[in-house]
Amino acid sequence: LLVDKPSGISSRDCLDLVRKILNEKKAGHCGTLDPLATGILPISIGEATKFSRYVSNLPKKYNVKILFGLETDTGDITGKEIYKTDAKFSTSELTKVLESFIGIQDQIPPMYSALKRNGKPLYYWARKGISLKRAPRSIEVRDINLKSIKKKEEIELEISCSKGTYIRTLVQSIGKSLHSAATVLELRRTHIGPFNENNSVKLDSSKDFYLKYILGSDEALKIFPKIVLSKEETKKIINGLQVDYNARQEKEGIVRLYEEEGS
């Protein structure tokens, strides 16, 4: 189920509400969104939870509104002010800096995140005023599109990136590269893999409405090649035997296996 998460609640709160409406014990969300953020949040239900990690690993696209000249402890406008500074840079300087962030890079996750440390999420320690050392993680920013400049201090970007990319951290890095500071005003996830916000449903929907829009597990796996097995091959797979289907696959990796129609 592709839910349009509203601002002001956590991804877990969103999941719990959907689980309650559908009366489903087994469910999970694929790809955490910050409480401030809105947008597409895939929720796997029942047996589809087995495929959650594949959806979570899909590339994402975000729209983000940025305020320059301000840095907060959370990296967004909901946090405590750390300091203010000037935002003195030209459009050409901004464009050059944005281009410099496209590509594979290391990023240190923020303290205000759901990553676990010593059995607790990092934000638990951050709220206690404790900063823990975090190992950098490899991410990829595939594209950054400058959508608008409303004021000198406020811009809107469209960012395409890999899983595990923290937009708040990226925004702070952009601010520092411009010899300024930056914080997230608004953040919306518009795409995750083949799914976009037009496929999502509002959170405050009824069970009957949700049931109309629940997708089959297969929809989440269409990024993988499809291979149809013969009756004999199907029997081998069921009995735990190997099947050679390399001739039908262009490269190594995960595939979707289907029974031959009618078998």
Language-model-detected regions and their locations in the chain:
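The conserved catalytic core of RNA pseudouridine synthases
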Residues: 20-24, 42, 132-179
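Short, structured patches in soluble enzyme cores that scaffold and shape functional sites
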Residues: 66-68, 127, 143-148, 159-163, ...
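Residue-level signal for inorganic ion chemistry
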Residues: 43, 64, 119, 170, ...
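Extended alpha-helical targeting/anchoring segments
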Residues: 113, 117-142
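Accessory RNA 3′-end/elbow-binding domains used by RNA modification enzymes
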Residues: 1-4, 10-33, 37-40, 92-100, ...
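Structural signature of FAD isoalloxazine-binding scaffolds in flavoprotein oxidoreductases
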Residues: 53-68, 132-146
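Glycine/acidic-rich beta-strand-loop module
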Residues: 26-56, 124
